[in-house]
């Protein structure tokens, strides 16, 4: 016999934080993706949208790698 439990309700502060688009952290700053594209991430407990995040691409990877190299040089 399988049983299930209800997914816990997110706290108000967490919901508020997740409500906006989540930026990428590159070179000490939170930035949007170069393309401006986003995608939704699901809550694994409910399948509902948990957050919207910026979708990084090759240009964003290049910016992050360049910043990392400069930090270590």
Swiss-Prot record:
Pathway membership, UniProt: Alcohol metabolism; ethanol degradation; acetate from ethanol: step 2/2
Keywords for this protein: NAD, Oxidoreductase
EC number of the protein: 1.2.1.3
Keyword Oxidoreductase: yes
Any one of the GO BP annotations: ethanol catabolic process
Top-tier EC class: oxidoreductase
Catalyses which reaction(s): an aldehyde + NAD(+) + H2O = a carboxylate + NADH + 2 H(+)
UniProt-recorded Gene Ontology molecular function terms: aldehyde dehydrogenase (NAD+) activity
Pfam family, one: Aldedh
Family membership noted in the UniProt record: Belongs to the aldehyde dehydrogenase family.
PANTHER family found in the cross-reference section: ALDEHYDE DEHYDROGENASE-RELATED
This protein's name: Aldehyde dehydrogenase
Species of the source: Geobacillus stearothermophilus (Bacillus stearothermophilus)
